Design a protein with these regions (language model features):
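N-terminal cap/lid segment of alpha/beta-hydrolase-fold proteins
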Residues: 51, 87-131
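Catalytic histidine-centered segment of alpha/beta-hydrolase-like enzymes
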Residues: 78, 325-337
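The serine-hydrolase catalytic nucleophile loop
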Residues: 145-158, 306
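Conserved alpha/beta-hydrolase
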Residues: 161-177
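Alpha/beta-hydrolase active-site loop
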Residues: 182-202
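Hydrolase active-site cap/lid region
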Residues: 221-273
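Short beta-strand/loop motif that positions the catalytic acidic residue
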Residues: 287-288, 294-296
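Conserved alpha/beta-hydrolase "acid-adjacent" motif
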Residues: 301-307
């Protein structure tokens, strides 16, 4: 189930340019930006066409990591049609070809976890600094509804090299290589519970959870329930973001609608009904949380600042708002990671 929707591609460049240039040369991003005139058609001037052309040039030159990054933007922001799904498949192909050159230990495997009375399979990536002992803790990590485990490789790589822990990287239900499972609050959490259980068997038993954007919703859940030993919430929606009457920016209404499993743009009533189930107020009213770090930028257009401030004053919880930056502090990401990395190390390892 998927759908396309009216979306000005230049709006995506406005919002995501800092993220695009984290993994690709500025001049290449600028060239694609100048060439793109429409979002969905797979033809010259189309988003997927122009990004895929850049990716193909890198692939032909043997620059597989850059090709994977470019194909990642080709399939952005949602697997709404066949050209986007093709771009994802090509991204995975190029990423696997690039893996032998990564400066980290890397393994791609498929795990089977309990899901809704049966089982579900999903690809995961394990990443660690070279020579990391087998008995190190494990940190689950994911992006959100539109930026997934392979897209964020550069960030994961830096974290793995800085943190004496093994990363277990995955895509949320409804996204990336897990789009065969619709995003629901409990179903998505059940998948993550299975990953946590697996993670406890492959290291010293200690498990952290680092969620970015919608991934932060799920890391807030694991943190508030105390089901992991350290939880990082970066730009995560928890309560006000799911309230009736909220607005959307930069195409997020269609991105979220696809992740939730709709086959056409949901009506306001349909979306608000789906959102109501995500509200974490019942968990926020409890006092069962483990150690938590909650971070975001003050100028987030997607997640109200209240969804960060609501954690202030909680036991074993640190809150950091980074000024003059937006969703997930993307334009000041180094500052965010300078808080997150040592906190994870101190909390999981001491």
């Amino acid at each position: 189930m998927s759908f396309t929707w009216p979306l000005d591609p230049q709006d995506l460049f406005v919002e995501r340019y800092p993220q695009m240039t984290l993994g690709l040369p500025v001049d290449e991003v600028d060239a694609v930006r100048a060439a793109v005139t429409e979002m969905w058609p797979d033809r010259p001037g189309g988003w997927v066409y122009e990004w895929s052309a850049l990716a193909a040039r890198h692939a032909e030159a043997g620059h597989h990591r850059l090709a994977a990054q470019a194909y990642g933007w080709a399939k952005f922001p949602s697997l709404a049609d066949d050209p986007k799904r093709t771009a994802l498949a090509r991204q995975v192909e190029q990423y696997v070809l690039a893996a032998p050159g990564f400066p980290v230990e890397f393994e791609r495997r498929t795990l089977t976890v309990p899901y809704r009375g049966g089982d579900a399979a999903l690809p995961i990536h394990l990443m660690a600094a070279p020579g990391l002992p087998a008995d190190a803790p494990v940190v689950l990590a994911s992006g959100g509804v539109d930026s997934w485990k392979t897209d964020l490789h550069g960030m994961w790589e830096q974290l793995a090299l800085a943190l004496p822990a093994r990363l277990l990287l995955f895509d949320l239900a409804g996204t990336g290589e897990t789009t065969h499972l619709p995003m629901t609050p409990d179903g998505g959490a059940e998948v993550i519970a299975g990953l946590v259980a697996f993670a406890r068997t492959i290291g010293d038993g200690g498990v952290g959870h680092f969620g970015i954007s919608m991934g932060g919703y799920y890391s807030a859940r694991t943190g508030l329930t105390g089901s992991v030993d350290a939880s990082v919430v970066l730009g995560g929606p928890v309560e006000r973001a799911f309230a009736p009457g909220r607005g959307f920016a930069f195409g997020m209404e269609g991105i979220v609608g696809n992740a939730l499993g709709f086959d056409a743009m949901p009506s306001t009533a349909e979306r608000e009904d789906a959102f109501a189930a995500f509200d974490l107020r019942p968990l926020l009213d409890q006092d069962a949380n483990g150690p938590m770090l909650v971070v975001n930028g003050t100028e987030d257009v997607h997640v109200p600042v209240d969804d960060t401030l609501v954690f202030e004053g909680r036991r074993d919880t640190r809150v950091e708002l980074i000024p003059d930056t937006g969703h997930c502090a993307i334009s000041r990401f180094g500052e965010a990671m300078a808080v997150i990395t040592p906190w994870l190390k101190d909390t999981l390892i001491g």
